Amino acid sequence: MAREDSVRCLRCLLYALNLLFWLMSISVLGVSAWIRDYLNNVLTLTAETRVEEAVILTYFPVVHPVMIAVCCFLILVGMLGYCGTVKRNLLLLVWYFGSLLVIFCVELACGVWTYEQEITVPVQWSDMITLKARMTNYGLPRYQWLTHAWNFFQREFKCCGVVYFTDWLEMTEMDWPPDSCCVREFPGCSKQAHHEDLSDLYQEGCGKKMYTFLRGTKQLQVLRFLGISIGVTQILAMILTITLLWALYYDRRDPGADQIMSLKNDTSQQLSCHSVELLKPSLTGIFEHTSMANSFNTHFEMEEL
């Protein structure tokens, strides 16, 4: 009975952990898509520079192929574990444990690679010149992708130009920076800020922001947190799976152990009840003999009187 309760508890815990696997995997896929949007815009602006090379070396080998593949595989493994837990199938649970172990090793290797990989990209003036040279194509109909990338980066990272917002005036024929440089953006805000109050424009350039992007972003922090959480959950799931396998294996190897213990308890209770039943007649007889003796003595005393 105790073993059956333990198995039931282990199964409930594995159900909960598999649900966590699905939720975390979906979250990691969403964060990876979130990072991809940032990476596409950064790569558009930093093409043919050292920054582009650093971005590719830092993010793409781990963030996209490995993490996406691991999360998709983990969703399938969660289904495998769920089926094995429901059916109490030892083979499915063994496959589930082995798959979790392989995924954990891959995640551990990726985590070590990410933290050990230190890309040092010194700021070079040639990179700044390359970034400035692309500013001349801003707003042109055939360079809408570049216009979108500049606007996205300036809004998200709260910067303007490459070194300073005056880069837009130097490198283009514009009389004022784009509206995406405004602290409070609205149509015509940059023109108003240029003529009235320059503090309404972002004062920091986007060049250094791109290098800061390589040092770690909030998206990458969230991704690392989710990766660590998935790893801890996998360790717990593997421990519970081993325990459940042990319980199910010995339950099948000695299926009557609990039944024998239960039978012993029932037999003991029945013997106790039977002993009480056997004692009842003897106690009744003793009581009757005692009563008869007392009545006889009383009758004898009355005759003597």
Swiss-Prot record:
The keyword Membrane applies. It is a multi-pass membrane protein. A lipid is attached at C9, C12, C83 (S-palmitoyl cysteine). SUPFAM superfamilies: Tetraspanin. Palmitoylated; required for interaction with ADAM10. The precise position of palmitoylated residues is unclear and occurs either on Cys-9, Cys-12 and/or Cys-83. Residues 34-59, 111-224 are extracellular. Residues 1-12, 81-89, 246-305 are cytoplasmic. Keywords: Angiogenesis, Cell membrane, Lipoprotein, Membrane, Palmitate, Transmembrane, Transmembrane helix. InterPro entries: Tetraspanin/Peripherin, Tetraspanin_animals, Tetraspanin_CS, Tetraspanin_EC2_sf. CDD domains: TM4SF12_like_LEL (cd03157). The chain crosses the membrane at residues 13-33, 60-80, 90-110, 225-245. It is found in: Cell membrane. Gene3D superfamilies: Tetraspanin (1.10.1450.10). GO terms for biological process: angiogenesis; cell surface receptor signaling pathway; regulation of angiogenesis; retina layer formation. The keyword Iron-sulfur does not apply. Signal peptide: none annotated. GO terms for cellular component: plasma membrane. Disulfide bonds: none annotated. Regulator of cell surface receptor signal transduction. Plays a central role in retinal vascularization by regulating norrin (NDP) signal transduction. Acts in concert with norrin (NDP) to promote FZD4 multimerization and subsequent activation of FZD4, leading to promote accumulation of beta-catenin (CTNNB1) and stimulate LEF/TCF-mediated transcriptional programs. Component of a complex, at least composed of TSPAN12, FZD4 and norrin (NDP). Belongs to the tetraspanin (TM4SF) family. This is Tetraspanin-12. It comes from Gallus gallus.
